[in-house]
Amino acid sequence: MDLLIYIERGGIIVNILILMNIIGFAIMIWKSFVFFMTNRSIETLSNEILDELKLTQNYELAQIKSSISLKISSIESGLNTIKIIASLSPLIGLLGTVIGILNSFDSISHLGLGDPTVFSSGISIALITTVAGLIVAIPHYIGYNYFIGSLDKIEIKLEKVILDKI
């Protein structure tokens, strides 16, 4: 079957999943750029944090970690959206599954079991939405975990560079 036919048969559920996928991938592309630039500017970030610490004359480890956390939180923005897409898309696909099966049983109750295509049409929609939900969820789940791992590495690098400078 052609992809466009699957999208058409999946209805509003597949269209919602496509929109979520576009939004999620746009955020992941944006975050890839942000993480790339952040990794290249660890020295600059560490100097900014050290300048802030110099103003307060507070070089305690807790204050250093707090300042790093503030910088990291700005880099982290947008990752929750990726996590939400990874979590919600299988559920939305499951909603489509339930709707498809409901349509199948509704068709049977109106037309009987004489024509198997009536029943199979609803089941087909159910499976299309399930697959679409998983297709959206899996790369976003992988992307989210990759970014969280990268964020941890950036935080460790920042901490090391700052502690080396003090």
Predicted regions located by residue number:
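Hydrophobic alpha-helical transmembrane segments of small proteolipidic membrane proteins, enriched
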Residues: 1-48, 52, 73-155, 160
